[in-house]
Amino acid sequence: MAKKSKIAKFKKQQKLVAQYQELRQELKKEKNYEALRKLPKDSHPNRMKMRDRIDGRPRAYMRKFGMSRVNFRKLAHEGKIPGVKKSSW
């Protein structure tokens, strides 16, 4: 489980990215780099480290499912992820 402060920071960062997304695109089209530079640092999506939706774990994140491999494995074994089943060969 990640620290509560890290999860809160991630949520705040998501809001900032969404808030400045359109403005950032307009400024890029206009090639107004001075105005882009004045935007908040955390409003750029590249600075965001994706986290597990369940417990906030930052490593081994699986984009397709929005969770880390640890929680993916646990939920897949319990049969709680639709369309995922254990394979054997």
Swiss-Prot record:
SUPFAM superfamilies: Glucocorticoid receptor-like (DNA-binding domain) (SSF57716). One of its GO terms (molecular function) is rRNA binding. Keywords: Ribonucleoprotein, Ribosomal protein, RNA-binding, rRNA-binding. Disulfide bonds: none annotated. Signal peptide: none annotated. It comes from the Bacteria. One of its GO terms (biological process) is translation. GO terms for cellular component: cytoplasm; small ribosomal subunit. Binds 16S rRNA, required for the assembly of 30S particles and may also be responsible for determining the conformation of the 16S rRNA at the A site. Part of the 30S ribosomal subunit. Contacts proteins S3 and S10. PANTHER family: 30S RIBOSOMAL PROTEIN S14 (PTHR19836), SMALL RIBOSOMAL SUBUNIT PROTEIN US14M (PTHR19836:SF19). HAMAP family: Ribosomal_uS14_1. Belongs to the universal ribosomal protein uS14 family. This is Small ribosomal subunit protein uS14A. It comes from Lactococcus lactis subsp. lactis (strain IL1403) (Streptococcus lactis). The lineage of its organism: Bacteria, Bacillati, Bacillota, Bacilli, Lactobacillales.
